[in-house]
């Protein structure tokens, strides 16, 4: 990096910071935080528990956004000042240090941009994830299990928790399907763009001739809705099936019909849950999954209508990302059009750069 390149980078980051300030309005955030603090001082504040909880969540979000912005702006202002001094004094040591820290500075500005993008209605929610293998038997079932592990490892890296709702083992390897929740702040916001078909190209470990195979798996993401969000489901529109649990989470197989499957006739959505020994709890979890999927479906319809698009173009059936392991190694996202070479790390859950790249591309 040279002086000109660094100078242009600073100008770009300053423009971004100025735009961020126009969007978030730091002074208004401070005023809103003061208003919330006064409201919390009222002895009657906690009488409405749901409202108090939502207010507190908003306070935490605003505080974090303001602190992240101010910290980034201070770092940027300091870098601009140091750069001017170092140039005037021909201080090569300071200039070299500034060049080294440039990626960190750029990343911190990007983090503030991401914070703004994760301020949607359900972005702070937990994420319900369903993974289904495509056609292709063992190959696709194994690919589905690799994706499942990738998301679990991503959750672990972030300190998030996960909970299995339904798990079906594959016949020879992998899984026939899995549904699980990732619990953590902004889990849905980060993962919401993972909806779609994920494609894998590799030398098959199940082919004695070591031929290259292409496999597909679909990923569906929906927000775990708060209990106070009301989604009406007419009982005549659903069918409940009860069966014996099997696979991971179904250790009590062949003892009780605790697993629950719900079919929603108007949409064709099918959800199932077998993670608990209690049929009642599994039914409640399955209903929560169904409500989340119906909510997500309604959002898609609204977005499709607003953009004048066919649902097929924005639904779950389109290919969003390719993972190529042979003859070369590359992961490429169709939305951001960015290619990544650290395939092994990505499949081990290092997907933040991909998720953030898509968020920025869709902003």
Swiss-Prot record:
User: Coiled-coil segments, which residues?
Assistant: none
Query: What keywords are assigned to this protein?
Result: Cytoplasm, Methylation, Protein biosynthesis
Concerning PTM, the database record says:
Methylated by PrmC. Methylation increases the termination efficiency of RF2.
Query: What molecular functions are annotated in GO for this chain?
Result: translation release factor activity, codon specific
**Main localization of the protein described in the UniProt heading:** cytoplasm
Carrying N5-methylglutamine, the residues are: 251
Q: Which GO terms describe its cellular component?
A: cytoplasm
Write down the InterPro entries for this protein, in alphabetical order: PCRF (IPR005139), Pep_chain_release_fac_I (IPR000352), Pep_chain_release_fac_I_sf (IPR045853), PrfB (IPR004374)
- Entry's localization field: Cytoplasm
Q: Which residues cross the membrane?
A: none
PANTHER family recorded for this chain?
Answer: CLASS I PEPTIDE CHAIN RELEASE FACTOR (PTHR43116:SF3), PEPTIDE CHAIN RELEASE FACTOR 2 (PTHR43116)
Q: What does this protein do?
A: Peptide chain release factor 2 directs the termination of translation in response to the peptide chain termination codons UGA and UAA.
Q: Which family is this sequence assigned to?
A: Belongs to the prokaryotic/mitochondrial release factor family.
Classification via HAMAP family: Rel_fac_2
Q: What protein does this entry describe?
A: Peptide chain release factor 2
Instruction: State the organism named in the record.
Output: Helicobacter pylori (strain HPAG1)
Gene that encodes the chain:
prfB
């Amino acid at each position: 990096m040279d002086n000109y390149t660094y100078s242009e980078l600073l100008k770009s980051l300053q423009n971004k910071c100025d735009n961020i300030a126009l969007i978030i309005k730091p002074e208004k955030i401070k005023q809103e935080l003061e208003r919330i603090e006064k409201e919390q001082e009222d002895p009657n504040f906690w009488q409405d528990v749901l409202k108090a909880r939502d207010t507190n969540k908003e306070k935490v979000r605003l505080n974090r956004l303001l602190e992240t912005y101010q910290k980034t702006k201070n770092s940027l202002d300091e870098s601009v000042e140091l750069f001017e001094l170092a140039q005037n004094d021909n201080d090569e040591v300071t200039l070299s240090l500034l060049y080294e820290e440039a990626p960190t500075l750029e990343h911190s500005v990007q983090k503030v941009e991401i914070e703004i993008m994760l301020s949607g209605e359900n972005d702070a929610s937990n994420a319900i994830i369903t993974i289904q293998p495509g056609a292709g038997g063992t190959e696709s079932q194994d690919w589905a299990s690799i994706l499942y592990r990738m998301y679990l490892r991503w959750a672990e890296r972030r300190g998030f928790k996960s909970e299995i709702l339904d798990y079906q083992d594959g016949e020879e390897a992998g899984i026939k399907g899995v549904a699980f929740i990732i619990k953590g702040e902004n889990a849905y916001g980060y993962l919401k763009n993972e909806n779609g078909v994920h494609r894998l190209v590799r030398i098959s470990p199940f082919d004695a001739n070591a031929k290259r195979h292409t496999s597909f798996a679909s990923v569906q993401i929906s927000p775990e809705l708060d209990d106070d969000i009301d989604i009406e489901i007419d009982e005549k529109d659903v069918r409940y099936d009860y069966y014996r649990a099997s696979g991971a989470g179904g250790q009590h197989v062949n003892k009780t019909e605790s697993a629950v499957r719900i079919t929603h006739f108007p949409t064709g959505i099918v959800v199932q849950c077998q993670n608990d020994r209690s049929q009642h709890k599994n039914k409640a979890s399955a209903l929560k999954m169904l409500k989340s999927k119906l909510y997500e479906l309604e959002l898609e319809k609204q977005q499709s209508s607003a953009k004048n698009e066919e649902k097929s173009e924005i639904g779950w059936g389109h290919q969003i990302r390719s993972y190529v392991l042979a003859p070369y190694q590359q992961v490429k996202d169709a939305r951001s059009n960015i290619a990544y070479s650290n395939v092994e790390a990505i499949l081990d859950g290092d997907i933040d750069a991909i998720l953030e790249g898509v968020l920025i591309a869709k902003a």
